[in-house]
Amino acid sequence: MIAAADVKALRERTGAGMMDCKKALTEANGDMEKAIEYLRKKGLATAAKRAGKVASEGLVHAYIHGGGRIGVLIEVNCETDFVAKTEDFRDLVHNLAMQVAASRPEYVAREDVPEEVLAKEKEILRAQALNEGKPEKVVEKIIAGRLEKFYQENCLLEQPFIKDMDRTVQDLINEKIAKLGEKIVVRRFVRYEVGEGIVQSEE
């Protein structure tokens, strides 16, 4: 028998409906964490079913850090104005702006990395591997492994989340998709830092 208090607690933690929470707890034999996982999967599936719906609502958020030394503008989209106004969504957008300020990503996703940048990076990684004396037959595997690190450092969605390094930014977004039941897309961002790109005079 599933306790009503557990159903209520699960609903508060996930934002899912009462009957969905009851079913999740039944499926998970009362295990709260497994029930949350069940709902996340279900929530993601629900959002995926509406993949044709355009995520055209959302927020543009400005974040200033370090006493005005670093500034970030970020646009994150969802499907409805209702979700855009929720505290959960606003909190997510703020956290994403903080992530950009702290971790300096260059791109939103790996698909956004230009072909010429990727080609140049592969060329550098190949030269590094050969200079280390690695045999030619394993060089491609080494390049693939180091490219993953490049993506993790330079693509926002693949970076470890600054408030919980065991999760990626994409994991964080997936949790919000499951909770809010809508597609959430990071559209674009720009990061400014005082003095960036200015060549200092030697005088």
Swiss-Prot record:
GO terms for cellular component: cytoplasm. The keyword Protein biosynthesis applies. Gene3D superfamilies: 1.10.286.20, DNA helicase RuvA subunit, C-terminal domain (1.10.8.10), Elongation factor Ts, dimerisation domain (3.30.479.20). Belongs to the EF-Ts family. NCBIfam families: tsf. This is Elongation factor Ts. It is found in: Cytoplasm. It holds the Pfam family EF_TS. Keywords: Cytoplasm, Elongation factor, Protein biosynthesis. SUPFAM superfamilies: Elongation factor Ts (EF-Ts), dimerisation domain (SSF54713), UBA-like (SSF46934). Associates with the EF-Tu.GDP complex and induces the exchange of GDP to GTP. It remains bound to the aminoacyl-tRNA.EF-Tu.GTP complex up to the GTP hydrolysis stage on the ribosome. The keyword Protein biosynthesis applies. One of its GO terms (molecular function) is translation elongation factor activity. CDD domains: UBA_EF-Ts (cd14275). It comes from Moorella thermoacetica (strain ATCC 39073 / JCM 9320). Residues 80-83 are annotated as: Involved in Mg(2+) ion dislocation from EF-Tu.
